Amino acid sequence: MVYKTKLGEMEISDESIFTFEKGIPGFEHLRKFALVFPQETFPIGWLLSLEDPEVGLPVVDPKLVRADYDPVVPSEDLEEIEAENQEALLFFCVLTIPPGKPEKTTINLRAPIILNQKKKKGIQTILENEDYQLRHLLSEEMERSKTVV
């Protein structure tokens, strides 16, 4: 089906669509989102609202940025997306890219987007891990990851 999104009109397949029962913080009124990876921004993907074409969040797999990323998800959040455990879930972290200053991009490692591919449900959670913050400088995290691997 074709949707109007923040990135323009896009053909989006059903397998890319996820329901967020409580929305996403700041966008609680929106429930349907699609995860897409346009070639021109890969490996950065986009979580696009299918209800408001102005809403789209740049996201990235946190393991690409921080190799030792090991989130502890609250059990009530696993229940909300009908997940038995964390193993089959997809994790993405939201990027904040300041206009004209991509070198100042930050990643939110504390509140990842978690997707249950099987049930097509998603949630943005706040992790119990104390060492993850809402804003980590992307370049510093990638540099740090080189020493961890």
From Swiss-Prot:
Key words, A-Z: Bacterial flagellum biogenesis, Chaperone, Cytoplasm, Translation regulation
GO biological process, one term: regulation of translation
Cellular component GO terms, alphabetical: cytoplasm
Localization, UniProt: Cytoplasm
Main location: cytoplasm
InterPro entries given in the database record: Flagellar_assembly_factor_FliW (IPR003775), Flagellar_assmbl_FliW_dom_sf (IPR024046)
Pfam family, one: FliW
UniProt superkingdom: Bacteria
Subunit structure: Interacts with translational regulator CsrA and flagellin(s).
The protein's role, per its UniProt record: Acts as an anti-CsrA protein, binds CsrA and prevents it from repressing translation of its target genes, one of which is flagellin. Binds to flagellin and participates in the assembly of the flagellum.
Stated family: Belongs to the FliW family.
Protein name: Flagellar assembly factor FliW
Source organism per UniProt: Thermotoga sp. (strain RQ2)
